[in-house]
Amino acid sequence: MHPFSRLFRNIQSLGEEEVQELLGPPEDALPLLAGEDLNHRVADALNLHLPTADLQWVHKTNAITGLYSNQAAQFNPHWIQPEFPELHLHNDLIQKLQQYFGPLTINEKRKLQLNFPARFFPKATKYFPLIKGIKNNYPNFALEHFFATANYLWTLWEAGILYLRKNQTTLTFKGKPYSWEHRQLVQHNGQQHKSHLQSRQNSSMVACSGHLLHNHLSSESVSVSTRNLSNNISDKSQKSTRTGLCSYKQIQTDRLEHLARISCGSKITIGQQGSSPKTLYKSISSNFRNQTWAYNSSRNSGHTTWFSSASNSNKSRSREKAYSSNSTSKRYSPPLNYEKSDFSSPGVRRRITRLDNNGTPTQCLWRSFYNTKPCGSYCIHHIVSSLDDWGPCTVTGDVTIKSPRTPRRITGGVFLVDKNPNNSSESRLVVDFSQFSRGHTRVHWPKFAVPNLQTLANLLSTNLQWLSLDVSAAFYHIPISPAAVPHLLVGSPGLERFNTCLSSSTHNRNNSQLQTMHNLCTRHVYSSLLLLFKTYGRKLHLLAHPFIMGFRKLPMGVGLSPFLLAQFTSALASMVRRNFPHCVVFAYMDDLVLGARTSEHLTAIYSHICSVFLDLGIHLNVNKTKWWGNHLHFMGYVITSSGVLPQDKHVKKISRYLRSVPVNQPLDYKICERLTGILNYVAPFTLCGYAALMPLYHAITSRTAFIFSSLYKSWLLSLYEELWPVVRQRGVVCTVFADATPTGWGIATTYQLLSGTFAFPLPIATAELIAACLARCWTGARLLGTDNSVVLSGKLTSFPWLLACVANWILRGTSFCYVPSALNPADLPSRGLLPVLRPLPRLRLRPQTSRISLWAASPPVSPRRPVRVAWSSPVQNCEPWIPP
């Protein structure tokens, strides 16, 4: 049935004779449909012209929202956070894969090396303050969302997915270290690594000098202060500048000599080392920055608990005695991570209590409330004092490694949303790394093959038994190099910065946090903390502290992640295909599809793949494993041997949305955008395709309103109620060729020549399209040869609207192949000339696969015939499945 038959008969401006002519033979009707006058008359009848600006736009329909009507995100206080298994790929993944699947191809090795480890080094990175770590997307549930997001981040850290920043050069995490992390290892399971101990022994002189400076600051008997030290050095530098007798290296040597002289009871001097000051400078000055860093980090690297102030002072006194007694030993060096010492200098103490490793006040908010009097009936003091032991302020992982300089900042904010539109009971973490997709920090992501609708039909439209697998937390399987951590930082500002009035307390030199912390004591915060304590218990104290974390596994908010995941899963699918040539294995992102000729054979393959993947460290989500039979549900489509159709839920959704569209009201372009995005998904299955939505496209590009008429709305409903499958392309030889000129057309086949003229001149692209439609109508060929690139592309939205809709209906399921004009046998008949007698060019269609293959050209694998397979199976006779 003609797609415009009912529509043309309902248009009063078209007479009966004109309607019969438009619905008549294609050689007469198609040139008329390309006429500009007819398209304007139909557009006026359907009210498809853009409305005037004085009309008031509609910004919301029953199901779709437009401009100025953003839907507020819904927060679920009872969100269930997912539990992540121990996601750790095998350390020798490539060697392990070769044991299972034989020698790998070059492409498979290249894809695996891209992911093991993944590398992300943008040219520029913007850093944001920690106050922007958790986005306030739910103003009515700000505190609940704050603690839920912090708990989600700590859950990821406990699963080994995140690094925890200890200081600017040290990271800690839980789990097993990878081989590239072994090179940066500092501590593993509470024991110092050998390489780290060796480097500390080599720099014992530098660390000892840093300890001497520490003792010098805390000793009252030493008359020389650090200010005098800097003045002496500056005086020497000024004198050397005036006289020109002292160089910069001599200034550094004098500084080291002065550090050695101010030692309390130390016997290490330059003269006793048996070397000249120049030699001493060469051995020590290279580590002078490390010495300064060791001194600074030793002041700020302590991890305290809210109740351990007395024990810390006792430990620090005993530790100071140990340092003074061992100061004469050459091999001794103080540890880098120790508890805060009780410095006698008030200036040093004030600097130490201001900032911790993450750049936040080290004064624990929990301890502050515990030590102060309650300010009222809703003071947080009542909650804090209910427990004697709230646990540590922070934790340390099993492994500590060195890292590049990691600032006290973040590169992206985080927030929680529903796991998917159909599951609002579970939460999902969203990481906003959008800075790498815009502005001067934009990164051009690599492209990879994505299967379109025709590719899926060509690859998977077969009569096989199907099974779909889902990789659990697929992105978090792929590790990232520790050098990329400074670019992928997330964190929490802590409860002390939760209130906006406390945001400036870290910049206040008087450290007025204790004076302003009671601004948190409100009835809402108090009641929310009581409910949160019922949920998290003692962990509430840990979640209230600030922290900075970096991704150890691949995050989902970076454009590089889909590319790397696609490479990883496609390499796995290629290896499985080589070892099971009798089955179909297809992977797209985290979805893996298996196909076999019998269900028993499919079960055997599934059990083997599950055991292999589990041994490699790849976790499959058993709950999402689905057996489809002969009807595969994949990427929202139903794929069978007869073709591809959309799932019923998408068809019902489109029908509901179209029926809810109001008639004769100007809808803003944002509503048109969202409605067109929904209709586009099913448009390839309709008779007119994307061309039916051209009036909506015109309104969107013009950024103006669009008015749905009752005729246009009913016509769209009739189109989307009748869907046709997208069938698989066949590899056939082209035997029909078409060509056209502005005044005529020509068709050549193996046994006849056809030609004709147009009643009026047409654009060359329009004439070529009409010639292709005539060739399809008169010969029924599903493969046509043409020399016009516009027709070859298959995109008909640039033609007149009526012609584009009818041409899409006629050419549905038709493929094209390019033939040069000099070799096109229909070229001369289109010009009204007799053709040259010569054989037709032999052109064969290759079905479109979008650079996606279902087989792997690789070294041959030795055939294996399992004896345990007793049923009739292709494995016994080694009959391979040949893809289309």
UniProtKB/Swiss-Prot annotation:
Chain sites annotated for binding Mg(2+): 470, 590-591
Annotated spans, Disordered: 299-345
Entry-linked InterPro entries: DNA/RNA_pol_sf, DNApol_viral_C, DNApol_viral_N, HBV_DPOL, Hepadnavirus_pol/RT, Rev_trsase/Diguanyl_cyclase, RT_dom
Any GO BP annotation: symbiont-mediated suppression of host innate immune response
Domain Reverse transcriptase: 398-639
Catalysis: reaction(s): DNA(n) + a 2'-deoxyribonucleoside 5'-triphosphate = DNA(n+1) + diphosphate; Endonucleolytic cleavage to 5'-phosphomonoester
Regulation: Activated by host HSP70 and HSP40 in vitro to be able to bind the epsilon loop of the pgRNA. Because deletion of the RNase H region renders the protein partly chaperone-independent, the chaperones may be needed indirectly to relieve occlusion of the RNA-binding site by this domain. Inhibited by several reverse-transcriptase inhibitors: Lamivudine, Adefovir and Entecavir.
EC number: 2.7.7.7, 2.7.7.49, 3.1.26.4
Region (Terminal protein domain (TP)) location: 1-184
Segments for region (Polymerase/reverse transcriptase domain (RT)): 388-729
Stored SUPFAM superfamilies: DNA/RNA polymerases (SSF56672)
GO molecular function, one term: DNA-directed DNA polymerase activity
Residues the UniProt record annotates as site (Priming of reverse-transcription by covalently linking the first nucleotide of the (-)DNA): 68
Spacer as annotated region, ranges: 185-387
Other remarks in the entry: Hepadnaviral virions contain probably just one P protein molecule per particle.
Function: Multifunctional enzyme that converts the viral RNA genome into dsDNA in viral cytoplasmic capsids. This enzyme displays a DNA polymerase activity that can copy either DNA or RNA templates, and a ribonuclease H (RNase H) activity that cleaves the RNA strand of RNA-DNA heteroduplexes in a partially processive 3'- to 5'-endonucleasic mode. Neo-synthesized pregenomic RNA (pgRNA) are encapsidated together with the P protein, and reverse-transcribed inside the nucleocapsid.
PANTHER family assigned: REVERSE TRANSCRIPTASE DOMAIN-CONTAINING PROTEIN, RIBONUCLEASE H
Family according to the record: Belongs to the hepadnaviridae P protein family.
Protein name: Protein P
Source organism per UniProt: Woodchuck hepatitis B virus (isolate 7) (WHV)
